[in-house]
Amino acid sequence: MDTQTNGTMTTFDYKDNWFVWSESQDTELRVGSSIGENWAVYAADLRTGEIIFVDGENDFFPKTRNFDPHPWSLSLNGSFVVYASYTANEDGIYPAIKIYDLNNHKLEIADTADSMQTTFGSPSVNDKNVVYLKYDSNGSSLWTYDIEKHKRMCIEPPEPLQEICITNSFIVGVSEWQQQKSESLYCYDFAHKKWSKQIDATTKLYPNNIDSTLEFAELQSSNDFITWRPITGNALYVWDITTNKVLDLSENVSGLIDYVLYPFDEDYLVWCETNTQTPETKYPCIKISSES
């Protein structure tokens, strides 16, 4: 499947017979930023082959702006695609959280920054809610958006969070980094409206003894499974929230992990790894439900 603008595909997600991606012709992408030049988000219906234009603009922003106009992260669940981008009104251009419904082809703004000093982290979506972090002069705050009721709500976490994702029933967040302190993984139960600290460097359910600072990177969710990697090294972990077990898949990893995938059968986990010594790329697969 080719890109639609002959640009660079920068991120993607897929679930429930949909594949969504963002692309850009922005020459600044090579330095990991974007000035907003000819970016777009598309969705492909894998049942019919139809490709849908979701959103996009051809703008030029100064490099000094405090937000990235190009969506660097997409979250897909059911018919909903969510991402952080921007919106414009008579007062100017502001960062925003956007929701696109693939069924009715409507684009909705879940939240808009009230000033250029406010930015958003990458949102995550389940079949009812969008969850995202908002950053301003006071630090970070955690927000949810009820898609059906069109209502926002702020949820106070036990401590400031730096990364979040949502599952069927939970919000999972990583505590903000502090020097010489391990990060912690917190879980918010929607049904009981309650936070709990689930994983840190002292947690007994963790499979191995932790000799160094515990770090969580690239948090991802599918059903009630959470995956993450440490910032350094090639370890890979899966947490089954329902059984409260952590699987250490490090022994199954033989190369550098490029990214983690959830196939359409969500009992399985697939990741892409490469070998620095050879041009070989592998896609190991493991059935995480039986491992749990």
What do these predicted ranges mean?
Residues 256-292:
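Blade-level signature of beta-propeller repeat domains, shared across WD40, Kelch, NHL, RCC1
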Residues 1-3, 50-64, 106-113, 150-156, ...:
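A short beta-strand motif characteristic of beta-propeller blades
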Residues 6-16, 62-77, 116-126, 158-169, ...:
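Repeated scaffold domains used in trafficking and secretory/extracellular systems
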Residues 27-42, 89-98, 137-144, 179-187, ...:
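Structural motif
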Residues 88-93, 113-147, 154-164, 173-179:
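Solenoidal tandem-repeat scaffolds enriched in leucines and small polar residues
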Residues 2-29:
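Beta-strand-rich domains and repeat architectures in extracellular enzymes and scaffolds
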Residues 45-49, 101-105, 146-150, 189-193, ...:
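Short loop/turn segments that connect beta-strands within beta-propeller blades
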